[in-house]
Amino acid sequence: MNHIIQDKYIPQQLLYFLAGRRCCQQFPCTFRTSEHEAFANNARSLGLRSQVVHVNGNSCVKVYKQACRHYLEEPKTLVLSSGATLNMFTLLSRKSLMGKEDLELYADLVSMKANASDLPSLHLPLPAIRPPNLRFWTEAQLNFLTAFLGHSLSDEILQSLYASRVIVYNAALCWDKSVFLPLVILDDCRNKKSNVKIMCIERQAILATYNSQRTANFFGEQLGETVGIQLPYFSAVSSSTFIIYSTAQYFLRSLTSQQFRNISHLVVNDVHLHDPYTDILLSEIRMALSSHQNLRVVLLSQMGNPKKFTDFFGEGLQLNMIKQPEVAPRVSYLNELHSCIALAGIHKGPDIYKEIPEAFRANNPRNEQMDKCLQAYGELGTDAALRPFLYAVNYDLAPVNYRHSLTGKTAVHFASELNKANHLRLLLFMGADPYIVDLFQQNAISLAAMNGNHECIDVLNSYSLHGYVVKSAKPDFVDYDLIIDIMYLLRTKPEYSPGEYSPGNILIILPTYYHIVKLNYMILSHCLTGSLQECSIFLLYDNMRNDYLQALVNASDETVKVVLATDIIESLCLKVPFKYQIDTACRLNNVYDTTSCSGDDRFEWVAKDALLRRELILQPNKGDVQCFRLISKEAYEELSETSQPSLQTMQLDKICLAVKLLSPNTIISEYLGITISPPPLINVHHAVQFLKKIDVLDDAEDVTWLGCRLMDIPVSCQLGRMLIFGILLRCLDPILTIVSSLSTADPLGIPFTEDIDNLWDRFTIYIQNSIKKERTYLSDNQFSDHFIFVRLYKEWQNRMHNRTPPLYLKDEYEFMLNGLMEQLTSIRSEIVSSLRAANLIHSRGKLSMNNLNQMSCNWHMVKAALTGGMYPNIYAVDTRKSSLKSAFSGNVSMHPNTVLRDFLEPLNISAQSFRTPWIVCNRQKSHIVYATLVVPLAVAMFSGHPRIRLSPICDSEMSLTDRNVNVFIDEWIWMVMSKATAEMVMRTRYYFFKMYHDLLKHCSELDMWRRDCEPVSQYTVLTDTLSKIFESEDGFVGFFKPPPITFLPTPQLPSLYLLSVNAHFSWAREVEENMLSKPHHFNSHFIERQFFVLYAGGDCEEFHSRNTPAFIESVLGKFVRPIDTPNRHIFVILYRKDPDMMLSISRAKFVNGVFMLQEYFRNNIPVFEILDACVSLNVQTPVFDGRLMSALIDKRVGNLIMELFAFRHHWIHKR
């Protein structure tokens, strides 16, 4: 048998591997040690490399192809500092710690598997089912019911519900099904005196809150009476509750204990969107129908053909109310939009910055390299010469329209001059502009004509037929400039508002919250400068606070509303008539990539069915409406008809965990395979293997104690594991900040070329380098992008501590920072609430918030927690081969975003400054986006499986006299260290993971975590010692001492910043202040503006504290009494001397007869900028000498100053 295995089976398996696509493969540990040599010899004969590795104490053979970059050529060395050795020895010498044999026994016998009876479940307190009380509808309630579009079909709906247990009610959003259906069912059960309990399932908590509140308002009651709600952190249910709203995710968590008892009707909304938890719930409902014969299921949909749902259940009826509208809205696509804007001759944007000198481009290393790329291409003109430039455009974010510093030529100029038509087509496809002129006033067209390059002339003539340049038509680019152009088209051109003045509400659909915040600032800045008609801005996005939604619902009908929304708008039935819709037609989708084993945030075009649903929000039957889609007609025709379900593309870690808690005895792949949208089997396999890797599932696919605790924490399993390590190492606050930052957009992300407005396109490299310098400054030589998150949040937190948010604008970056920090703070609060609900944070004792943050000021402890939490995303630097190696990804590169590398800098140059070869990171596909260098001891201590025994320690093969040993942390992480060091590290590791196990298993036992409890006191000694050890290790490898990270125990941070700012500058506020009795016809060119400059003497705060509004009014009254009307605005500009700075610009107005200054913008702008602008535009220069308290200035100068404040770019003008 041995002969057959060694001579036939092993060579056959290696040949299969050689013919396959894998670059490496691990062969199972069922082979005997004697056969390892056979593997090595056969692999060597086939040109393969092999290595014996250890997995959970068992020897395995791993075989690599020559091109495989996972292979660790040699182990990384671990040498402890003297201070770490002393502290570790002192810790292990304590009598209270277990000995080596006890630790081995502990690792072998203690199971991490949670018993089925111990699995946490949520109890949904459903009162016993009974008939509702007899009551009669009031006239107002009857009018409310008859206003529903489906009221005339009530009898048909009820007959269908009695005829079949499952019905699919298919109707547009305006039918308001999730409120109407429960009321109809309740009324019927009340008349028939039958038992009823209606559970209404939404896909998000904000939808459940909104619909439940509206239903309760119908009864004139509070939530918790007839209508209730069940959410993770808010519950209102009583014995008299008959309609309960919840989310699919929360309801699933209660099924293990509740099993559809005391429910007569289940109404599931938005099934067409295929929310992953809704799809799983449908599987549970299908199984429950066999044992709950009286259960009635109503599926609410908005899709063209809902037959797939009745096919899935094998029974049911369809009520399809979606019909082709009689009057369709006018739909305009990208090409038509550009033509209309070009014909309209819209004039927007700041004049003052259009001719800004390009002094910012000088003495920049990246500019020098880009100049060399263009120069080489101009001299050679070959494909190889163009390739470095294209690399810079595609990977290092250089603009495709980059101009040579001396000649002003772009790559398009050179391609036209050299008659490289294929290069020209490629550059134009990438968004290059052929109309840019160089220093000799030549563009690509004139150069091609001058040199008689007819092939290039044909390409350019074909391109020029459109009469405009389309900047980009990719789903990952949102053209904010085009959206602003459309706003100008709608607000300032009378031909788009025929007849009586009727501006109409505007709905703008954007892919993410980040895009909402950015566009919010751009619209505000254009409105405050008087260029756009004033309006009220409202925001709707996923997981928003209810205050944002109520602000829109309660807004006056006379208010002109501009609503910026994500795709949540497809589920919100709002009583707001929209006249115009601007749809970016794209969405952000997290797609799991099987080749890199990671999720990738990818922007995609939405499907045609989603565009149709958005179009129907306009309700064309109520008047002339128009839809603008920022996608070309050709791209629209190529879109898929229906959206792909999320289960088939997303990362499945939380889904697999939810399935295992629902059905502990079912294999995850089998369960997901019978859902209505089964995911690819390879995705499920990768997710299960990953969960086993990080100890969420054990080898038998059972849920561990870690998995039990992570289920209800609203982050991915890996980020949840990082929170657990933050709790264990008592540095929770910075870990909370890092986890929350990774869950939202990065305010200091390096922007792509297309993400920069047209106005600043020439300064793309300068902007990117400025942001890079800011990241370097915030990292403070810590070689960590995660440290930037902590420091940025702390600096913002210190500025905002116990203060109301500023209700003036500074610049776009500050506005976006405040908006993103608002979202980050909200995510932090939600995570903390979930940790409390999971009993991982207590109100007192060793797990109190104060105690869990005793190490939050120590960055070395935070890095240790990052190492344990980010495992297995650990990379090793191979400086000899200038590559990064990991267990998962082969070809990996560092994204320009990370502080571990500079732009266009090879890895071997960056790695020279690295203090350690180990990197923990967050990655997307083949890019390391955020990384932190960590000491080898942290990798040895916290990576790998929690139950590693001493058996992975093997004698070193370097020499017989060598006293070092090899330690295999997992199948890839391989270290060499002295035998004494190995034993100390492994024993300390065991002691730490004993604490890890005790926390996860016993965190609900409050008595165990009292301050005077003996085992817990030992854990305090452990973390205190670890802090000293890692502090010593950081100094030993050469890390700089980090700046102190302050911990604010009870920060009172401002919330709802964007809501406050938008309300402060809203048109509704003007109406409330009795400024207007009704909207006036608006044309920005006919508004009279007066500008006064006032000498402040100090900063703005000093000026406003020293001078009352009455005094300011008297100063202005020396020239003219400030009378502010809709067509006459008074602005006050504050300035100071030494240094000469303009400080702010405010609007003088009367509120109910009282004079006040409403501050619009505040910034520090050098006076010389306006003086230079006045000279270049031949405008009389104002005097800023400080001798006069106030002065009236030319309105042209005032407009320029206004633009200086409104359109100032933080990174270009930062001083």
From Swiss-Prot:
Membrane as UniProt keyword: no
One BP term from GO: oogenesis
Signal peptide (residue range): none
Tissue specificity note: Expressed in testis and in 5-8 germline stem cells of ovaries, immediately adjacent to terminal filament. Expressed in ovarian germline cells throughout the germarium (at protein level).
SUPFAM superfamilies to which the protein is assigned, alphabetical: Ankyrin repeat, P-loop containing nucleoside triphosphate hydrolases
Free-text disruption phenotype from the record: Flies exhibit abnormal cysts undergoing transit amplification containing an excess number of cells that do not differentiate into gametes.
Protein task: Forms a complex with tut and bam involved in 3'UTR-dependent post-transcriptional repression of several 3'-RNA processing factors, which promotes germline stem cell lineage differentiation and mitosis-to-meiosis transition. Part of a complex with bam involved in 3'-UTR-dependent translational repression of a subset of mRNAs, including those for mei-P26, nanos and shg/E-cadherin; may act as a promiscuous RNA-binding protein tethering bam to its target mRNAs. Required for regulating the progression of gonialblast cells through transit amplification and differentiation into gametes.
Name the UniProt record assigns to this protein: Protein benign gonial cell neoplasm
UniProt source species: Drosophila melanogaster
Gene: bgcn
